[in-house]
């Protein structure tokens, strides 16, 4: 199912988005990385290869089915990834646990109040100088019907960057990933920042 989703749904754009997310995060061997809204764990699998055996990868998602699939994928690949059910506004980890926190295509599901709570939690679990990379859909103004309801909490990259800045993060950068012409992919953007 993930293969179909990655390969055909958006003409491989999701794979490119995940790769760019990991690259922007400057993940290194031995890093501890948290994937917030990990879904079925595809990004976490790539991150596990990047951090090596000396690193740590954890993923949380509120979906029980997604976490079950992620655990199966990790077991099949013998990847030591900790997947658990959880929500961004109440991360089940001690303070200053992670070098990097990633979130891909998840923030658009949340209202602004939960985004703020979630960013405060990310700040709490990141080590000083830790890196945050958020990738999410852009161009919410063009969505209509069911897509508009699905992306009800969507925001522009500038709005998301402002929330990240308000949460106390430094050295903010944004980047846009334009969809190919005639693609169903709505376009995405990245917000990268560091914990003070």
Task: List PLM regions with ranges.
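A short glycine-rich, Lys/Arg-flanked "PGG" loop and its adjoining helix->strand segment in the class I
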Residues: 116-128
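A short SAM/SAH-binding and catalytic strip from SAM-dependent methyltransferases
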Residues: 100-113
């Amino acid at each position: 199912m993930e293969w179909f989703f990655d390969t055909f749904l958006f003409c491989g754009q999701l794979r490119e988005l995940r790769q760019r997310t990991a690259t922007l995060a400057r993940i290194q061997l031995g890093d501890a990385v948290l994937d917030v809204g990990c879904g079925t764990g595809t990004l976490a699998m790539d991150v596990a290869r990047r951090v090596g055996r000396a690193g740590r990868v954890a993923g949380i998602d509120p979906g029980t089915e997604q976490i079950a699939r992620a655990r199966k994928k990790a077991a099949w690949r013998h990847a030591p990834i900790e997947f658990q059910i959880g929500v961004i506004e109440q991360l089940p980890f001690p303070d200053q646990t992670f070098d990097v926190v990633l979130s891909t295509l998840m923030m658009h599901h949340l209202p602004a109040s939960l985004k703020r709570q979630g960013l405060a939690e990310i700040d709490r679990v990141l080590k000083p100088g830790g890196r945050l990379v958020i990738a999410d859909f852009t161009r919410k103004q063009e969505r209509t019907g069911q897509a508009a309801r699905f992306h009800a909490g969507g925001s522009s990259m500038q709005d998301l960057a402002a929330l990240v800045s308000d949460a106390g993060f430094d050295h903010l950068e944004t980047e846009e990933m334009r969809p190919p012409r005639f693609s169903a992919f709505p376009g995405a953007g990245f917000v990268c920042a560091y914990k003070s």
